[in-house]
Amino acid sequence: MSNIFQWQLHGDGKTLAPGEVVEPDERLTWVRTAGIGAQHVIAMFGATFLVPILTGFDPSTTLFFTAMSTALFLLINRNVLPSYLGSSFGFIAPITAVSTANKGIAVASFGIMVTGILLALVGVLVHYAGSKWIDIIMPPVVNGAIVAIIGFNLAPSVWTNFQAAPDTALVTLLAVLLVAVLFKGLLGRLNILVGVIIGYVYACIRGQVDFSAIGDAAWIGFPKFHLPQADFSILPMFIPVVLVPVAEN
């Protein structure tokens, strides 16, 4: 346990040759590591907060469970495979269908729970039997199609958000592209982080950021928990979602 959070400095910690990779047990200088970590947090926010907002779940509860699952994952594999376990976009369609049928979050939680159990069983099978069978059942062309379909399904929500503030969206996108093209080294790799910062500053200048929620929010709070309510009729909509994380990971 003592060496889980210990990393060796990769080279001089400042430069990386083209194609060079920083291994899981290595790190760059702390400033560069913090920058890359901050960008990963920005990338995490997309799924961790957008999915509950679109499905009606509580974002703080989602953040709590993703944090717990990530911590457990890192402890189990002893940080050999550093990763963040966020919410999956694959659940948006079945949860939306359940909500449309007025079955409630408790029923949707049951579908998520069953899907999670099945995915855990797939993980056990991969651990003991390997992953060759996944490559046979789901070749790259199938995996790519599944991931692409998820992106296409999110297009309507992206367009809705774009219409809310098209100027901010364009400024952010332009900043991301320009930083990636014009700058080399670490700054070019942090184009997402830089683009989001520029877009946020622009939104503040335009008066598009509402800070009232910060003043109204409690300093300390607890997530809103829901007990699953069994409804086997919704399982045909949820069970296929198992294929999504298998294809993504």
What is each of the regions a protein language model found here?
Residues 71-83, 180-184, 242-245:
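Transmembrane alpha-helix interface/packing and boundary motifs in multi-pass membrane proteins
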Residues 37-40, 113, 164-180, 230, ...:
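Entry/N-cap segments of selected transmembrane alpha helices
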Residues 44, 199, 203-249:
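Membrane-embedded hairpin module used as a gating/binding unit in multi-pass transport
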Residues 57-64, 79-92, 133-143, 188-194:
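Short, non-helical or kinked segments that cap or interrupt transmembrane helices
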Residues 102-214:
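Membrane-embedded alpha-helical modules
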Residues 38, 68, 88, 114-117, ...:
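Hydrophobic residues within alpha-helical transmembrane segments
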Residues 2-82, 90-102:
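N-terminal signal-anchor module of multipass membrane proteins
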Residues 59-61, 105-106, 140-143, 167, ...:
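Membrane-interfacial loop-to-helix junctions in multi-pass transporters
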